[in-house]
Amino acid sequence: MARTTPIERYRNIGISAHIDAGKTTTTERVLFYTGVSHKIGEVHDGAATMDWMEQEQERGITITSAATTAFWSGMGKQFQPHRINIIDTPGHVDFTIEVERSMRVLDGAVMVYCAVGGVQPQSETVWRQANKYKVPRIAFVNKMDRTGANFLRCVEHIKTRLKGNPVPLQLNIGSEENFKGVIDLVKMKAINWSEADQGVSFDYEDVPAELLEKAQEMRMTLVEAAAEASEDLMEKYLGGEELTEEEIKKALRQRVLNNEIILVTCGSAFKNKGVQAMLDAVVDYLPAPTDVAAIDGLKLDGETKDERHASDDEPFAALAFKIATDPFVGNLTFFRVYSGVVNSGDSVLNSVKEKRERFGRIVQMHANKREEIKEVRAGDIAAAIGLKDVTTGDTLCDEKAPIILERMEFPEPVISIAVEPKTKADQEKMGLALGRLAQEDPSFRVWTDEESGQTIIAGMGELHLDIIVDRMRREFKVEANVGKPQVAYRETIRNTVKDIEGKHAKQSGGRGQYGHVVIDMYPLEEGKAYEFVNDIKGGVIPGEFIPGVDKGIREQLKSGPLAGYPVMDLGVRLHFGSYHDVDSSELAFKIAASMAFKAGFMKANPVLLEPIMKVEVETPEDYMGDVIGDLNRRRGLIEGMEDGPSGKIVRALVPLAEMFGYATALRSATQGRASYAMEFAKYHDAPTNVAQAVIEERKSK
């Protein structure tokens, strides 16, 4: 089967935003204008096409990033049909993992901001992730019809809060209830969308006289930004020549692809204005798969570099970026094809697990409707039904040309709770349900506490875990009791200790056991986790026993000597020891290493680390004192304050242990008028009194 849309006419984009900036409504309008869904779904009444899990409809927030395919030929039918694959991304901080995961497989992104709220805390997180994966982006300032809407303030926020380089592509005509349309600064025409057909048809009109001066000034900025793309254009521009519309667009596109500028558009998705022109900007300025650098990978040895270009002629390589459980067909594995072609029925290699997988059926998703297709090609995003052993971040590739595409990094959970099934019958179902959910979401972990025998679930925040428990009830019909949230503390050392000895010797008839190690232990910088350096000279410990030393230490890292919490940011150097020809074994060295580790750890100024959250509270000014006082009582460190759209914004760093139940406390302190967002910032030494209380509580169990 030949390719139906040339790969140059593909756009793989994410639409991403702060919660409530109107992203789902924006996506709905995109689907409506591209002719996919003929009735616009409103989030207000819980009928949006993209939000397909029951809970999302109830809470009105998007949880799973559904992938949808749509076609667009321009609002004036000025393009050949372009295939736009949209990945809807959640805006709530507890689901940042979903955003990270989708950023990994996008080529470009549309950042949706609220014209009233501007750039909010979650937008910064999403922005950082887009920077990390070098995703070119444009911005859409939504909700221009709302009281307090201000387009240019939002543009300013992109510069000051996100350190981006925004260049408006449009200027709004009126705002709040007088929002009429936009001025296209490239064409210097006003766009007026028809209300009769929900904005499908439109007219170009002259720029309103009262906005002409402002529009000309903004167009100059836009043309200057375009001229900076090349020396030839700059010469032409400085020589007083007009740049053609074609030249301006081409130059702006180049600068967006290089991540040098952010083009900003505006509108009101709810009022059917502006989304159409934003879609044109997606085609004009965001990259096709062929505009993006080849994707890097490694050969199966894990060391030799390899890469794949966006071409049907290269060997098949794809990345699984999401697993979803579907009530009718079981597991759906969403994947992005980077190169090559695969047909349903083909066998491929999961190179991360080194297992064969067979593509049974392949479906293209439209939110929660699916169309079965026979093949997928480079640039496509689709879902496979019936893959057995694929988890998020795995590579699927041609068996004859294996490659491992870079793995995604997933954050460690910061909060855990114990869950117990309400009845014996729920016990088995709960294990199955949690296993399924953990396969879908790598930032969610499940384990059994060895001491208490309880099942522990851990995730990125209270809301994250609420939703997991809720999904167990709805999708798997498992009723569970939930314990009190527990903080994920960590342990580390602050000093270096040298020549710590660990000796395990048992000689009591028959074959004995003998292992003897001498190690140094030292702190590592934050985020380095663990390193093991083998400095054995002259074979005082034979090579085959060295992995045993590493294993012994790794096992101890899972449960530190201080209070049994995982150990992080610590290095070990093995530099001396001894062995016995007959009695030494890997196990003996493993035991010796763990003895040395325990002894050394307690001498190296051990500390308990607690997770610190970045908290941002938006509050009316009247309650500012109460909010700050409360954050101080919670051991918060106030970082700064600034004006927000509806009062003041307070930024603080607060230990997670002090933030439980904060939502309720904030509501009652401000009569429900303040809101807050929080995300994990870092681990930090817990104060002595806190650390002692935590350690004593652990020991009393």
Curated annotation (Swiss-Prot):
Biological processes annotated in GO: ribosome disassembly
Subcellular localization: Cytoplasm
CDD domains named among the record's database cross-references: EF-G, EFG_III, EFG_mtEFG1_IV, EFG_mtEFG_C, EFG_mtEFG_II
UniProt domain tr-type G: residue ranges: 8-290
Gene Ontology CC terms: cytoplasm
Entry GO MF terms: GTP binding; GTPase activity; guanosine tetraphosphate binding; translation elongation factor activity
Intrachain S-S bonds: none
InterPro entries: EFG_II, EFG_III, EFG_III/V, EFG_IV, EFG_V, EFG_V-like, EFTu-like_2, G_TR_CS
Record flagged with keyword Protein transport: no
Keywords attached to this entry: Cytoplasm, Elongation factor, GTP-binding, Nucleotide-binding, Protein biosynthesis
Residues reported to bind GTP: 17-24, 88-92, 142-145
UniProt cross-references to PANTHER family, sorted A to Z: RIBOSOME-RELEASING FACTOR 2, MITOCHONDRIAL, TRANSLATION ELONGATION FACTOR G-RELATED
Family label: Belongs to the TRAFAC class translation factor GTPase superfamily. Classic translation factor GTPase family. EF-G/EF-2 subfamily.
Function: Catalyzes the GTP-dependent ribosomal translocation step during translation elongation. During this step, the ribosome changes from the pre-translocational (PRE) to the post-translocational (POST) state as the newly formed A-site-bound peptidyl-tRNA and P-site-bound deacylated tRNA move to the P and E sites, respectively. Catalyzes the coordinated movement of the two tRNA molecules, the mRNA and conformational changes in the ribosome.
Protein name, per record: Elongation factor G
Organism: Aeromonas hydrophila subsp. hydrophila (strain ATCC 7966 / DSM 30187 / BCRC 13018 / CCUG 14551 / JCM 1027 / KCTC 2358 / NCIMB 9240 / NCTC 8049)
